[in-house]
């Protein structure tokens, strides 16, 4: 951690130099966050925190925000929610009630975000979250909740369209596609499932398998046995990091060959490094990729962000989209304070409702329900151990390798 902090400080030192002499004159805007440093969401919790910290230091190095002629620097106070929703809610209440923090960042994951939102609403505390995609979070009428990422029902809808188009090119009827699905029984994965179910109806497809993962996410061999016996055309797995790792490991053990295999949470599950043969050719949905045509004045292009983050955090061989979207949340806060020209919670909340900006992460335009409906998901394929955007075709950086044929 000390090495990481030192590298980041060095990377930003030149940018910070012009304002260093006046740093002591700046006020502080404290943001609060309960983020998973331990427990089942720890991998993406660390990604989230690193994204927040990187953006805070970058924005502070450029002068932070100026409100009514006075400069302010961002600071984030963290607690470890231990991947426990009840604990997350307790800690957010502590941040607001005891630590007197008036502006919040979200935790990682829909279950934890679902737990904290009643607290932030109770205290009328604005929260900008970048790591919870469940559609249900935006149907409760919350007025202080703002999410910037594509909602989870969108994660694999492009996959169904892709599979249908490929079937047509092969002279096949898309309605005959044999789709096998298995999901973790949690808010996020059930939203992913619903999005798929809605999309397959457009092509009159009835999935041949629609199973649930066991609670411990340790074994899906029974499901994979059925997949092989039924000769599925498309295989879908959504089970966060542990589910993705289990799927990759057991597909390798069982030599599963399916023309299209899609898995969520590929990066944080480290399936490329841990299961290089089994993961080859898998399709992975993502909210962001460094090849995307998106930019802003702070981070430059998506590729610029990718390169600068890797220089500061060299332990990252691939920059997960969780890092990028966490950093984008800090940009949203800066934009809101700049437009509100106030530290008043209600004035800042009102500014958040009018968010409409372009960032290295993509466009962020907040809708009345607090979501960012213009954000879409793209599909990447693991090719030669690298993630390559392959769908939609108009943004693809590489040709889709189809059908998938893993060399076990």
Give residue spans per PLM region.
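Extracytoplasmic ligand/sensor domains, especially the bilobed periplasmic-binding protein
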Residues: 101-209, 259-284
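Extracellular/periplasmic periplasmic-binding protein-like sensory domains
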Residues: 251-327, 338, 387, 393-408
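Segments of small-molecule ligand-sensing domains
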Residues: 309-324, 330-390
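Signal peptide-proximal N-terminal region
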Residues: 24-26, 50-76, 168-170, 174, ...
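Short, low-complexity disordered leader/linker segments with a strong preference
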Residues: 1-30, 406-408
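Extracytoplasmic "Venus flytrap"
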Residues: 26-53, 79-85, 108-111, 182-191, ...
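Stable alpha-helical elements in mature extracytoplasmic
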Residues: 44, 48-55, 88-92, 100, ...
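Beta-alpha junction/loop-to-helix N-cap segments that form part of ligand/metal-binding clefts
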Residues: 30, 43-50, 65-139, 148-151, ...
